[in-house]
């Protein structure tokens, strides 16, 4: 099966979307089709052995629309709002020309109602034909300017797939044709001297209704096009980050080339203020990089030789040479844009109701309009009255508002998430996340830093600690397990010389064994020792005491004799407790899974306030526990690293990969967090809830609008309350309904992440009685009084800042007389050669 993408032209409403989907789904070999009205794009899953792209294009064209395949070579960083901007410009031009002809038309038709003097040539019985023909002359250009409504509308009627343009075309055409008919009847009666009958027809001309309907629809389309452009602002900002050029080293010379021409293996320069053109690795120099646009992290990150940099990051200082690892078209930025656009173009399950309604909406509206016409004629009302009712039904009905209700909110929501470094892969994932009531957390790398350290060691029997560390470090040197790295890292840091290890064996969920200097070394948990017949009872009291403090005990046996115990701790992330509290406030239960012993797990549970904990688990147990929770009726999200937790992430209702960095294409995850901050998972769930609330609001008002508007236009309330809707007001209402839906979706841009809300609260709480604000900046790299003096100087040089720097605390205590962004404070200190760890 292959996934193909197409641009689709000619769609104007949800009915168009439904017709295209229906036509393509009938093609033999098409497995799935998804059409996005907002983006004018279509995604098709097809069997290449049965069909091809041309067959899909033919199906779209046979339905009355146009399509072309989006090739792999198309620029992935092309602006997603370009089409909306072009559409907006075209609509604006049509609008001004339409208004130019509508104003004199209304002046002639309605001027007398506003007591505006009208030239005598347009008044009186003798001038009735001049009055009518002048209206005709001003209406024809408006029809010509907006003729696409008629061409598209009637073409789709012929193809038996009527859409919103069909409703507009029928309503405007009916007004115009009846008015032309009335003009001819006026001429007929005036030629026979029957001025009374001619006057009666003159009073029932609808030229101004025809002109006003078309102009008001164009007003709505113009505003809608502008709003559509704004829904993709987040992606457009990402696109604008990509630098146009890069400076590469070629034949020992600096050469400026287009960014897309930087090839894998090329070496490019990175200076202060320059943007990174593509993903790469530093091979010389060092720099400080601002990755905020990609990850949402405001503090610049120091990069040294061997470190990776991401495309569209900005160098905040330093000089470096970087080797290109991925071209611009395959870079992290391009992947982010592709993910966000794919998510925006996907369809949420909540949209199915709107799709079903849209598929039959226009035929039903046309039927209601015809019924309205016939009923009012049967009730004895004039043809002009009945026609007025039918036209009102046609022009007030709005399938657009239904079609835009979901995709606008999805596009804004996924774009907003990307600004926070949260990548949501599909609309379905976004919808599912809003109903999550249980979050399962992997301990290592999610709740903790994922970088265990050897804290202490205790030898037993005839063994000493130095010997214990050397043998353990040597045995673990062949393992890539985080606990093994903690042991070998400690040995390296403390200059402990290691020996080669032989016969290395790893027991999943237990530990390792190896032969070092002819001695059998066994390292692992108590279960491994018990299974190997090693008695560790002498160390159990000590092990429990350390485990109560969150440390992991690793038992060591040498030549099948208990030799000692290593204590390893994985530091809890600073933001983990805050994130767990955030989940609690959102009504979400938290469950931590770990392979550690129960004592260690309980200690971490207590520190973080986690609801439940499952310990001493094998890797395959995580997916089983998630299934158990799902069987209890819970909606489960799993948060892990996306590699070791792949089965669990796939099993969960929503899989969230944390700390992905450049590796954002994790297939097992539905949501990818660029940073290792658990708060972003809280933000993802809260954003999902906001998006779903917005979608439901949009669908509710779209359905209510049509449910009330159509009966009102048909005259249901005329007999009871005397309410009668003029077609012009119906057209205005239809135009505004779509604009209101899009505008409501744009409110999601006001959503704030957990980090932003925390910062806002901190800002309020740090204000002193005199209105000044206080902040504390943690700084690395200060070694002496000269350092503190330098930091004090650069901070005090900023307008509105008074700083007191403490060498002992490694902090700057800042008082602000006015609002100064954290980024400004950080940059000043970073440029001075120091590292900012955080600002509170």
Which residues are covered by each model-predicted region?
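Juxtamembrane coupling segments of multi-pass membrane pumps/enzymes
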Residues: 73, 79, 186-190, 195-197, ...
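Conserved ATP-binding TGD loop and adjacent catalytic N/P-domain core of P-type ATPases
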Residues: 18, 353, 436, 516-518, ...
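Conserved cytosolic catalytic loops of P-type ATPases
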Residues: 28-47, 54, 205-207, 236-330, ...
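Membrane-embedded alpha-helical bundles of multi-pass transporters
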Residues: 114-130, 158, 177, 416, ...
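Flexible metal-binding regulatory segments at protein termini and peripheral loops
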Residues: 1-132, 142, 252-254, 334, ...
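Transmembrane helix-loop-helix hairpins at the membrane interface
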Residues: 90-245, 356, 457, 722-727, ...
């Amino acid at each position: 099966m292959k996934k193909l993408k197409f641009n689709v032209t000619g769609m104007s409403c949800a009915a168009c979307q439904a017709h295209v989907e229906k036509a393509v789904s009938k093609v033999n070999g098409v497995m799935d089709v998804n059409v996005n009205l907002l983006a004018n794009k279509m995604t098709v899953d097809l069997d290449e052995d049965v069909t091809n792209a041309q067959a899909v294009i033919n199906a779209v064209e046979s339905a009355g629309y146009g399509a072309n395949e989006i090739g792999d070579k198309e620029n992935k960083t092309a602006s997603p709002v370009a089409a909306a901007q072009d559409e907006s410009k075209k609509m604006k031009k049509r609008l001004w020309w339409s208004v130019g002809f509508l104003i004199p038309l209304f002046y002639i038709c309605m001027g007398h109602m506003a007591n505006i003097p009208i030239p005598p040539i347009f008044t009186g019985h003798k001038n009735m034909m001049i009055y009518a023909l002048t209206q005709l002359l001003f209406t024809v250009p408006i029809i010509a300017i907006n003729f696409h409504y008629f061409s598209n509308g009637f073409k789709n009627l012929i193809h038996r797939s009527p859409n919103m343009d069909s409703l507009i075309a029928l309503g405007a055409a009916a007004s115009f044709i009846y008015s032309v008919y009335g003009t001819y009847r006026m001429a007929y009666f005036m030629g026979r001297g029957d001025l009374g009958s001619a006057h009666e027809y003159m009073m029932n001309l609808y030229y101004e209704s025809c002109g006003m309907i078309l102009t008001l629809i164009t007003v709505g389309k113009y505003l809608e096009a502008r709003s559509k452009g704004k829904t993709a602002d987040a992606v457009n900002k990402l696109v604008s980050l990509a630098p146009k050029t890069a400076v590469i080293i070629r034949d020992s010379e600096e050469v400026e080339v287009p960014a897309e021409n930087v090839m894998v293996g090329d070496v490019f320069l990175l200076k202060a203020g320059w943007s990174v053109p593509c993903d790469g690795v530093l091979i010389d120099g060092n720099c400080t990089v601002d990755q905020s646009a990609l990850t949402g992290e405001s503090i610049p990150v120091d990069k040294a030789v061997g470190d990776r940099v991401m495309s569209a990051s900005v160098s905040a200082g330093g000089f470096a040479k970087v080797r290109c690892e991925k071209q611009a078209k395959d870079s992290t930025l391009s992947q982010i844009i592709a993910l966000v656009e794919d998510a925006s173009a996907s369809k949420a399950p909540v949209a199915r109701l709107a799709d079903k309604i849209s598929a039959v909406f226009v035929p039903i509206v046309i039927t209601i309009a015809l019924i309205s016409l016939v009923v009012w004629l049967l009730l004895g009302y004039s043809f002009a009255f009945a026609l007025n009712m039918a036209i009102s039904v046609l022009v007030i009905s709005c399938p657009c508002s239904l079609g835009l209700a979901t995709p606008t909110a999805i596009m804004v929501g996924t774009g907003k998430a990307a600004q926070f470094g949260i990548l949501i892969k599909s609309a379905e994932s976004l919808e599912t996340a809003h109903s999550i009531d249980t979050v399962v957390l992997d301990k290592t790398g999610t709740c903790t830093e994922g970088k265990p350290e050897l804290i202490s060691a205790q030898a037993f029997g005839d063994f000493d600690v130095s010997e214990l560390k050397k043998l353990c470090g040597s045995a673990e040197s062949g393992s890539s397990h985080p606990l093994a790295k903690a042991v070998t890292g400690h040995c390296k840091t403390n200059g402990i010389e290691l020996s080669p290890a032989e016969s290395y064996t790893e027991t999943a969920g237990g530990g390792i064994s190896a032969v070092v200097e002819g001695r059998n070394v066994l390292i692992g948990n108590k279960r491994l020792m018990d299974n190997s017949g090693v008695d560790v009872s002498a160390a159990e009291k000590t092990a429990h005491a350390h485990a109560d403090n969150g440390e992991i005990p690793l038992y060591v046996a040498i030549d099948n004799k208990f030799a000692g115990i290593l204590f390893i701790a994985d530091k809890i992330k600073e933001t983990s407790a805050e994130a767990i509290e955030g989940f609690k406030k959102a009504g979400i239960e938290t469950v931590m899974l770990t392979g550690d012993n129960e004592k260690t797990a309980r200690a971490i549970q207590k520190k973080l306030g986690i609801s439940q904990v499952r310990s001493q688990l094998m890797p395959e147990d995580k997916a089983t526990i998630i299934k158990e929770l799902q069987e209890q009726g819970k909606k489960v999200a799993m948060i892990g690293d996306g590699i070791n937790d792949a089965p669990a992430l796939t099993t969960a209702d929503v899989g969230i990969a944390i700390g992905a960095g450049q590796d954002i294409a994790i297939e097992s995850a539905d949501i990818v967090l660029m940073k290792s901050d658990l708060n972003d998972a809280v933000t993802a769930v809260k954003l999902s809830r906001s998006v779903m609330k917005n979608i439901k609001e949009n669908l509710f008002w779209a359905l209510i609008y049509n449910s009330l508007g159509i009966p009102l236009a048909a005259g249901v309330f005329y007999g009871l309350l005397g309410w009668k809707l003029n077609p012009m007001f119906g057209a205005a209402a239809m135009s505004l309904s779509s604009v209101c839906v899009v505008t409501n979706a744009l409110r999601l841009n006001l959503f704030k992440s957990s980090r932003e809300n925390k910062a806002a609260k901190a800002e309020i709480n740090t204000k002193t009685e005199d209105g000044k604000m206080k902040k504390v900046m943690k700084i690395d790299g200060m070694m002496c009084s000269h350092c503190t003096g330098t930091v004090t100087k650069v901070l005090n040089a900023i307008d509105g800042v008074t700083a007191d720097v403490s060498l002992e605390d490694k902090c700057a205590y800042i008082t602000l007389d006015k609002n100064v962004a954290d980024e400004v404070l950080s940059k000043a200190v970073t440029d001075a050669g120091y590292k900012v760890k955080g600002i509170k």
